[in-house]
Amino acid sequence: MGSQSSKAPRGDVTAEEAAGASPAKVNGQENGHVKSNGDLSPKGEGESPPVNGTEEAAGATGDAIEPAPPSQGAEAKGEVPPKETPKKKKKFSFKKPFKLSGLSFKRNRKEGGGDSSASSPTEEEQEQGEISACGEEGTAQEGKAAATPESQEPQAKGAEASAAAKGGDTEEAGPQAAEPSTPSGPESDPAPASEQNE
Protein backbone atom coordinates (compact mmCIF):
# COMPACT_ATOMS: atom_id res chain seq x y z
CA MET A 1 0.00 0.00 0.00
CA GLY A 2 1.28 3.36 -0.88
CA SER A 3 1.52 6.17 1.59
CA GLN A 4 -0.35 9.45 1.20
CA SER A 5 2.86 11.38 0.69
CA SER A 6 3.72 9.43 -2.45
CA LYS A 7 0.33 10.26 -3.95
CA ALA A 8 0.61 13.97 -3.21
CA PRO A 9 1.07 16.18 -6.29
CA ARG A 10 4.13 17.82 -4.78
CA GLY A 11 6.71 15.91 -2.80
CA ASP A 12 7.03 18.52 -0.02
CA VAL A 13 3.29 18.73 0.84
CA THR A 14 1.82 15.89 2.91
CA ALA A 15 -1.83 14.87 3.07
CA GLU A 16 -2.29 16.30 6.57
CA GLU A 17 -0.99 19.69 5.52
CA ALA A 18 -3.22 19.64 2.45
CA ALA A 19 -6.22 18.81 4.65
CA GLY A 20 -5.41 21.69 6.98
CA ALA A 21 -5.06 24.17 4.13
CA SER A 22 -8.24 23.14 2.30
CA PRO A 23 -11.33 25.11 3.39
CA ALA A 24 -13.66 22.22 2.52
CA LYS A 25 -11.96 19.90 4.97
CA VAL A 26 -12.30 22.41 7.81
CA ASN A 27 -16.06 21.82 7.80
CA GLY A 28 -15.59 18.12 8.35
CA GLN A 29 -15.64 17.06 4.74
CA GLU A 30 -13.37 14.14 3.97
CA ASN A 31 -12.90 12.62 0.51
CA GLY A 32 -16.01 14.38 -0.76
CA HIS A 33 -18.22 13.08 2.08
CA VAL A 34 -19.47 15.10 4.99
CA LYS A 35 -18.63 13.66 8.39
CA SER A 36 -21.23 14.26 11.07
CA ASN A 37 -20.92 13.30 14.69
CA GLY A 38 -23.90 14.71 16.54
CA ASP A 39 -24.51 18.40 15.86
CA LEU A 40 -24.43 19.26 12.16
CA SER A 41 -24.30 23.02 12.48
CA PRO A 42 -20.76 24.42 12.63
CA LYS A 43 -21.97 27.33 14.80
CA GLY A 44 -23.54 25.25 17.57
CA GLU A 45 -24.85 28.40 19.34
CA GLY A 46 -27.88 29.21 17.22
CA GLU A 47 -31.06 27.19 17.46
CA SER A 48 -31.54 25.15 14.33
CA PRO A 49 -34.34 22.71 13.63
CA PRO A 50 -33.45 19.04 13.52
CA VAL A 51 -32.76 17.53 10.13
CA ASN A 52 -35.77 15.19 10.19
CA GLY A 53 -38.45 17.73 11.13
CA THR A 54 -39.30 20.66 13.38
CA GLU A 55 -39.30 20.64 17.15
CA GLU A 56 -42.67 22.42 17.40
CA ALA A 57 -44.44 19.67 15.46
CA ALA A 58 -43.10 16.93 17.69
CA GLY A 59 -43.90 18.86 20.88
CA ALA A 60 -47.43 19.89 19.82
CA THR A 61 -48.66 16.43 18.92
CA GLY A 62 -47.29 14.78 22.04
CA ASP A 63 -46.26 11.68 20.11
CA ALA A 64 -42.90 11.47 21.75
CA ILE A 65 -41.74 7.90 22.04
CA GLU A 66 -41.21 6.96 25.63
CA PRO A 67 -40.05 3.59 26.85
CA ALA A 68 -42.96 1.52 28.10
CA PRO A 69 -42.92 0.60 31.77
CA PRO A 70 -41.29 -2.82 31.99
CA SER A 71 -43.45 -5.73 33.03
CA GLN A 72 -42.34 -8.16 35.72
CA GLY A 73 -40.96 -10.58 33.14
CA ALA A 74 -38.99 -7.81 31.46
CA GLU A 75 -37.60 -6.66 34.81
CA ALA A 76 -36.36 -10.14 35.53
CA LYS A 77 -34.71 -10.29 32.13
CA GLY A 78 -33.15 -6.86 32.62
CA GLU A 79 -31.68 -7.72 36.00
CA VAL A 80 -30.46 -11.21 35.18
CA PRO A 81 -28.50 -11.85 32.00
CA PRO A 82 -30.19 -14.45 29.76
CA LYS A 83 -27.19 -16.81 29.95
CA GLU A 84 -27.67 -17.36 33.68
CA THR A 85 -30.99 -19.14 33.25
CA PRO A 86 -30.94 -22.66 34.67
CA LYS A 87 -30.41 -25.21 31.93
CA LYS A 88 -32.67 -28.21 31.85
CA LYS A 89 -30.89 -31.50 31.58
CA LYS A 90 -31.85 -33.23 28.36
CA LYS A 91 -32.85 -36.83 28.77
CA PHE A 92 -31.11 -39.14 26.35
CA SER A 93 -33.28 -41.80 24.78
CA PHE A 94 -31.97 -44.81 22.92
CA LYS A 95 -33.59 -45.43 19.57
CA LYS A 96 -31.54 -48.50 18.70
CA PRO A 97 -29.69 -50.87 21.00
CA PHE A 98 -25.91 -50.58 20.83
CA LYS A 99 -22.81 -51.99 22.47
CA LEU A 100 -20.09 -49.92 24.02
CA SER A 101 -16.90 -51.55 25.29
CA GLY A 102 -18.56 -54.93 25.72
CA LEU A 103 -21.69 -53.58 27.41
CA SER A 104 -24.94 -53.55 25.52
CA PHE A 105 -27.37 -50.72 26.12
CA LYS A 106 -31.03 -51.25 25.42
CA ARG A 107 -33.96 -48.90 25.47
CA ASN A 108 -35.86 -48.95 28.76
CA ARG A 109 -39.64 -48.63 28.60
CA LYS A 110 -40.16 -47.09 31.99
CA GLU A 111 -43.08 -44.65 31.97
CA GLY A 112 -42.26 -43.12 35.36
CA GLY A 113 -41.18 -39.49 35.52
CA GLY A 114 -38.77 -40.10 38.39
CA ASP A 115 -35.23 -38.96 38.92
CA SER A 116 -32.85 -39.67 36.05
CA SER A 117 -30.39 -41.41 38.36
CA ALA A 118 -33.15 -43.71 39.62
CA SER A 119 -34.51 -44.52 36.16
CA SER A 120 -31.15 -45.31 34.55
CA PRO A 121 -29.15 -48.03 36.28
CA THR A 122 -25.40 -47.87 36.52
CA GLU A 123 -23.25 -49.83 34.10
CA GLU A 124 -22.60 -52.59 36.62
CA GLU A 125 -26.29 -53.05 37.38
CA GLN A 126 -27.08 -52.96 33.69
CA GLU A 127 -24.44 -55.60 32.97
CA GLN A 128 -25.89 -57.85 35.68
CA GLY A 129 -29.37 -57.34 34.20
CA GLU A 130 -28.10 -58.14 30.70
CA ILE A 131 -26.57 -61.43 31.81
CA SER A 132 -29.74 -62.54 33.58
CA ALA A 133 -31.91 -61.34 30.67
CA CYS A 134 -29.75 -63.27 28.18
CA GLY A 135 -30.16 -66.41 30.27
CA GLU A 136 -33.95 -66.07 30.34
CA GLU A 137 -34.22 -65.14 26.67
CA GLY A 138 -31.83 -67.91 25.67
CA THR A 139 -34.10 -70.73 26.86
CA ALA A 140 -37.12 -69.20 25.12
CA GLN A 141 -35.14 -68.55 21.95
CA GLU A 142 -33.81 -72.10 21.78
CA GLY A 143 -37.34 -73.48 21.91
CA LYS A 144 -38.53 -71.14 19.15
CA ALA A 145 -35.45 -71.77 17.02
CA ALA A 146 -35.99 -75.53 17.14
CA ALA A 147 -39.59 -75.12 15.97
CA THR A 148 -38.89 -72.76 13.01
CA PRO A 149 -35.18 -72.64 12.19
CA GLU A 150 -35.43 -70.55 8.96
CA SER A 151 -37.27 -67.55 10.42
CA GLN A 152 -35.38 -67.59 13.71
CA GLU A 153 -31.77 -67.59 12.51
CA PRO A 154 -31.00 -64.14 13.91
CA GLN A 155 -32.31 -65.37 17.27
CA ALA A 156 -30.18 -68.50 17.00
CA LYS A 157 -27.07 -66.36 17.16
CA GLY A 158 -28.41 -64.72 20.32
CA ALA A 159 -29.30 -68.14 21.72
CA GLU A 160 -25.78 -69.38 21.02
CA ALA A 161 -24.31 -66.41 22.87
CA SER A 162 -26.65 -66.87 25.81
CA ALA A 163 -25.96 -70.61 25.89
CA ALA A 164 -22.24 -69.92 25.93
CA ALA A 165 -22.78 -67.44 28.76
CA LYS A 166 -24.78 -70.07 30.66
CA GLY A 167 -22.17 -72.69 29.96
CA GLY A 168 -24.92 -75.16 29.03
CA ASP A 169 -26.31 -76.62 25.81
CA THR A 170 -24.10 -75.42 22.98
CA GLU A 171 -24.82 -78.47 20.85
CA GLU A 172 -28.39 -77.38 20.14
CA ALA A 173 -27.40 -73.86 19.05
CA GLY A 174 -24.34 -75.05 17.08
CA PRO A 175 -26.09 -76.76 14.11
CA GLN A 176 -28.54 -73.89 13.70
CA ALA A 177 -25.76 -71.31 13.51
CA ALA A 178 -23.93 -73.46 10.92
CA GLU A 179 -26.84 -73.14 8.47
CA PRO A 180 -26.42 -70.50 5.75
CA SER A 181 -27.81 -67.18 6.89
CA THR A 182 -30.69 -66.47 4.51
CA PRO A 183 -33.29 -64.71 6.60
CA SER A 184 -36.76 -64.96 5.17
CA GLY A 185 -39.57 -62.50 5.71
CA PRO A 186 -39.45 -58.90 6.87
CA GLU A 187 -36.75 -59.59 9.46
CA SER A 188 -33.70 -58.87 7.33
CA ASP A 189 -32.21 -56.85 10.17
CA PRO A 190 -29.10 -58.44 11.73
CA ALA A 191 -30.37 -57.57 15.25
CA PRO A 192 -32.25 -60.38 17.01
CA ALA A 193 -36.02 -60.03 17.11
CA SER A 194 -35.99 -60.15 20.91
CA GLU A 195 -34.02 -56.91 21.01
CA GLN A 196 -36.43 -55.29 18.56
CA ASN A 197 -39.44 -56.17 20.71
CA GLU A 198 -38.02 -54.59 23.83
Swiss-Prot record:
Phosphorylated. Phosphorylation at Ser-120 and Thr-182 is non-redundantly catalyzed by MAPK8 in vivo. Phosphorylation at Thr-148 is preferentially catalyzed by MAPK8 in vivo, but this modification can also be catalyzed by other kinases in the absence of MAPK8. May be phosphorylated by protein kinase C, which disrupts the interaction with calmodulin. The keyword Membrane applies. The modification Phosphothreonine is found at T14, T85, T148, T170, T182. GO terms for cellular component: cytoplasm; cytoskeleton; plasma membrane. PROSITE patterns: MARCKS_1, MARCKS_2. Binds to filamentous actin (F-actin), but not to monomeric G-actin, independently of its phosphorylation status. Interacts with calmodulin. This is MARCKS-related protein. It comes from Bos taurus (Bovine). The gene is MARCKSL1.
